[in-house]
Amino acid sequence: MANKWRCSIALAVLSLTGCAYIPQKPLVEGATTAAPSVATAPVPNGAIFQVVQPVYYGYQPLFEDRRPRNIGDTLTITLQENVSASKNSSANASRNGKNTFSAALTPRFLKGLIGGDKTDLDMEAENTFGGKGGANANNTFKGTITVTVDRLLANGNLHVVGEKQIAINQGTEFIRFSGVVNPRTINANNTVSSNQVADARIEYVGNGYINEAQNMGWLQRFFLNVAPF
């Protein structure tokens, strides 16, 4: 019997320990890089003009720039995100009521309780409610990340994805990015601002003891969920 209680307590502790980790769904899912498929070399046919290989296999026209246009090409994203928002709300409600009741004659069975032959009854009620709320948020994210073209859309836009990992002491920082780039917005130095990327997904997370110290413990989260006040 004692062994059963010990096993039950151990299972309960393990279950609560499992609640200590809060899984976070990543914004950028799937592979964070892409590479062109290997093409077979053309067979010489003896003609003067041979069929050239595609651009992403080494061939580059003389008068064309080096902007990405094929799967596997790289592009540098300049992260320039400044987001600020504020919200204020207030509400006031007030209600007053007054009722007066009087009777010239008091029932016999109430004379001993309230005395006299005349009964006066006054009732007053007052309710007042006031509430205010406000929220402010200001986020700034600056940096650079080089991404890879992993998909070509039918209208010529490029779907890009990339990841950067930075290991600092005992923690690792991850920067993930994905979005749709219009080739016309790419600069001559092969960069584009994140403000000009459609459907942008920017994720900056980390792991290690510093990141764990910023999370609330499982016991604190338990009491926070069940506390009625």
Swiss-Prot record:
Q: Lipidated positions for S-diacylglycerol cysteine?
A: 19
Gene Ontology molecular function, alphabetical: cytoskeletal motor activity
Which GO biological process categories is it annotated with? bacterial-type flagellum-dependent cell motility
Tell me yes or no: is Lipoprotein among this UniProt entry's keywords. yes
Family membership noted in the UniProt record: Belongs to the FlgH family.
Q: How does it assemble?
A: The basal body constitutes a major portion of the flagellar organelle and consists of four rings (L,P,S, and M) mounted on a central rod.
Name used for this protein in its record: Flagellar L-ring protein
- Gene name of the encoded protein: flgH
